[in-house]
């Protein structure tokens, strides 16, 4: 429903290899930059002007040359940030459901890739699969 009501939105994604290469924080910033780029493309397609100010949840991104504000606990204070968080979570959950079919035995459909007991049991039983982050697994294995 959020997507249908929004004037525009953008989704940015990076894979596990990028996260392993540049770390989770930098990968998050990269994905957020991609999301802003997609947002601006969608706005342009809709005939709207580009984004001129961005609110982020507890983060600033130097690569984005648009005025921005970091809002601590932004998803609890700003409706647009909360909506973006929901879009991100639903998108990730759908991707993990697809991975559950592709890589059975890790309970991705339930744990969404988070470090749950069932997920760790799947790793111990089957080893890692191509979507696992090696940097995270160093802490676990």
Show where each model-derived region lies.
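RNase H-like, Mg2+-dependent phosphodiesterase core
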Residues: 1-141
């Amino acid at each position: 429903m959020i997507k249908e009501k929004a004037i525009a939105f953008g989704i940015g994604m990076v894979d596990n290899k990028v996260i392993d290469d540049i770390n989770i924080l930098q990968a998050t910033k990269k994905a957020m930059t991609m999301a802003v780029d997609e947002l601006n493309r969608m706005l342009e397609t809709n005939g709207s002007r580009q984004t001129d100010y961005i609110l982020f949840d507890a983060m600033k991104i130097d690569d984005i040359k648009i005025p921005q504000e970091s809002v601590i606990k932004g998803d609890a204070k700003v409706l647009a940030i909360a909506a973006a968080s929901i879009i991100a979570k639903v998108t990730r959950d759908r991707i993990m459901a697809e991975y559950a079919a592709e890589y059975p035995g890790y309970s991705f459909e339930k744990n969404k890739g988070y470090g749950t007991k069932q997920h760790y049991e799947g790793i111990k039983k089957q080893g890692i699969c191509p979507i696992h982050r090696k940097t995270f697994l160093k802490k676990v294995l």
